[in-house]
Amino acid sequence: MGYRSDVGLALSKAGAEQLREELRALNKNSETFSETTAFLNATDKHLKHEATGAELYLWSWLKWYEHYPDVRFMEDLMGKLESDDFLFLRIGEDMNDNEERGNFWDNPFELSILRTITSI
């Protein structure tokens, strides 16, 4: 069980390059490296915008717990990035649990939060 979230992360070219640099700096035998590479490979969607080098990562129904090594790595990465190099969006299970960080709003993926009411 546990609390689940949907997470989106848009990275500018510089942000994506820093992600790769931070991964290369990890000990390849560490839990953080194995958990983070598995996490990045298990996205629901990963897109690269060829013209700009920006990248998009989307995960759904994810446990975003800061004590998990992969989440800690991503949190640390966002703490190091310039705010214009990333946009992090998280929607939790609770209606009022939305999180936005970073200023990469002019990303080529138009990443945003949208809550709607629908019917049949």
Please state what every model-predicted region is.
Residues 1-25:
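Short, extreme N-terminal segment that most often corresponds to the first beta-strand
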Residues 24-120:
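Charged interaction segments
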